[in-house]
Amino acid sequence: MAKRELQDKGSTEHRAKKKSRNEKHTKKAEDSQASAQSSETQYTDPKEPSPAVIEKFLEENSVKITDTLEGATKLHPITSFSHLPTCNSALYRPLESFTSPTAIQSATWPFLFSGRDVIGIAETGSGKTLGFGLPCLKNLQDSAKKGKPYKPTAVMISPTRELAMQIHDQISKFAELVDIKVACIFGGVKKEEQREALKTAAIVVATPGRLKDLQNDGSVDLGKVKYLVLDEADRMLDKGFEQDIKDIIRPMPVSKRQTVMFTATWPPVVRDLAATFMTSPVTVTIGGEPSADPRANTRIKQVVEVVKPHEKEQRLVQLLNKYQKGPSSSDKILVFCLYKKEAVRVERLLWNKGFKVAGIHGDLGQQERFKSLESFKKGVSTVLVATDVAARGLDIPSVKLVINVTFPLTVEDYVHRIGRTGRAGAEGHAITLFTEVDKAQSGALINVLKAANQDVPEDLLKFGATVKKKQHDAYGAFYKDVDTNKTSTKIVFDD
């Protein structure tokens, strides 16, 4: 009897908690809708495009917009900078050097300027930094008119320090015009300077690990953050930052926070994160249906050459001589190696062959990495040899060609590598030297090539089209899923 009463009591408490959670979620959705509707009254499209123009834009850019909020006002893509909401004209001044918004900017801006939570699923190099950055700055400007804004008011989290620095640099160009301070927080450097920057920063761009450290020691209070961006969410979760992200978000307000997530893929773990921290988000997909599998930019011409391991470096020199001659002698070429020692050896080889080469890999300090990147960006060096530390998020303008000397450990990293070319609407070119050593990745690579309508060489097909099971982070190739519902086998020993 006592056991029955205890079960009834537990069941009652469970129902009460569930009801409380549902009521809380409903109220949050209502608050979000009210906020969005309030913002929508401020945002008006001065030249609303015709249905035919909208349909053409969506079709040409493979844009799909899914809004889960019932009764929400239907907003149209912002296809011209002249359609942006009114604000301090100085904020929009840098836009004069651009002709028109990118597809991801056009599709997400109406919702972001209206205060809605947004999930953007798009390739790297699609202009998403400005996509989430401009609405954030406009939001901060509006807050400043009502009084002194709390610091920090906006937090933007990225998976690597290189990407954090890139986001910081791009947003700072706009922020400094309207007197908004931006701090860049990442590991590998002393914390004291970062603590000082946090005292005046309205926007914090950070990697998860260092931000959590500063949060834990009381250097930063995130209790009044109103604008949160998770950039390259899939990559952050791949790197094991899920718990750090949850700890960072926990003290932030719920109903008054606008949350933005950008991701290149849409696996279950990213969906779960979105379901946990976002309210009735609008999902904007560029380039077809969202997929859990990595997809390459279709504007990149992918070429796979099957070679013998000892032929790779000789073939690399041949390719560089071919693609850096005559009028193309100053074209930027990014060369990827798998290991640091390999990168150092290849860099030395190319230097001895007379190429203007720089290197970036894990053994270099922050200043050395920065120096190499700047040299490559400015054209002082026309070849950059890198390991995967530079594969994700770096925005290096006008990379004409990516060469993979050694195939990466995963096809996801392959997609990230070649994504350094063909950015911001430009055409790109990637050449991969594939050997028998890499044959475990042949099936996954073939799928990426086919999905992007690229040629699959016969030599690659010989390795097989089977996709190998992804290894577990902790248990490697010996990991297997265990069916916990399966009846155990009883083992009986004879006497």
From Swiss-Prot:
| Class of enzymatic activity (EC top level) | hydrolase
Catalyses which reaction(s): ATP + H2O = ADP + phosphate + H(+)
Q: Bias regions of kind Basic residues — which residues?
A: 15-27
For this entry, list what GO says about its biological process. endonucleolytic cleavage in ITS1 upstream of 5.8S rRNA from tricistronic rRNA transcript (SSU-rRNA, 5.8S rRNA, LSU-rRNA)
Q: Where is the composition biased (Basic and acidic residues)?
A: 1-14
- MF (Gene Ontology): ATP binding; ATP hydrolysis activity; RNA binding; RNA helicase activity
Q: Which InterPro entries match?
A: DEAD/DEAH_box_helicase_dom, Helicase_ATP-bd, Helicase_C-like, P-loop_NTPase, RNA-helicase_DEAD-box_CS
Q: Which PROSITE patterns match?
A: DEAD_ATP_HELICASE (PS00039), HELICASE_ATP_BIND_1 (PS51192), HELICASE_CTER (PS51194)
- Motif Q motif, chain ranges: 97-105
Sorted alphabetically, which CDD domains does this protein's record hold? Answer: DEADc, SF2_C_DEAD
Question: Region annotation Disordered: residue ranges?
Answer: 1-49
Primary site of residence: nucleus
> Could you tell me which residue ranges the Helicase ATP-binding domain spans?
109-284
Q: Could you tell me the keywords of this UniProt record?
A: ATP-binding, Helicase, Hydrolase, Nucleotide-binding, Nucleus, Ribosome biogenesis, RNA-binding, rRNA processing
Recorded GO cellular component terms are: nucleolus; preribosome, large subunit precursor
What highest taxon heads this organism's lineage? Eukaryota
Q: Outline the extent of the Helicase C-terminal domain.
A: 315-464
For this protein, the Enzyme Commission number is 3.6.4.13
Motif range (DEAD box): 231-234
Q: Localized where?
A: Nucleus, Nucleolus
Database matches in PANTHER family: ATP-DEPENDENT RNA HELICASE DBP3
Q: What does this protein do?
A: ATP-dependent RNA helicase required for 60S ribosomal subunit synthesis. Involved in efficient pre-rRNA processing, predominantly at site A3, which is necessary for the normal formation of 25S and 5.8S rRNAs.
What family does this chain come from, according to its entry?
Belongs to the DEAD box helicase family. DDX5/DBP2 subfamily.
Can you quote the domain comment? The Q motif is unique to and characteristic of the DEAD box family of RNA helicases and controls ATP binding and hydrolysis.
Q: Can you say what this protein is called? A: ATP-dependent RNA helicase dbp3
The species this protein belongs to is Aspergillus niger (strain ATCC MYA-4892 / CBS 513.88 / FGSC A1513)
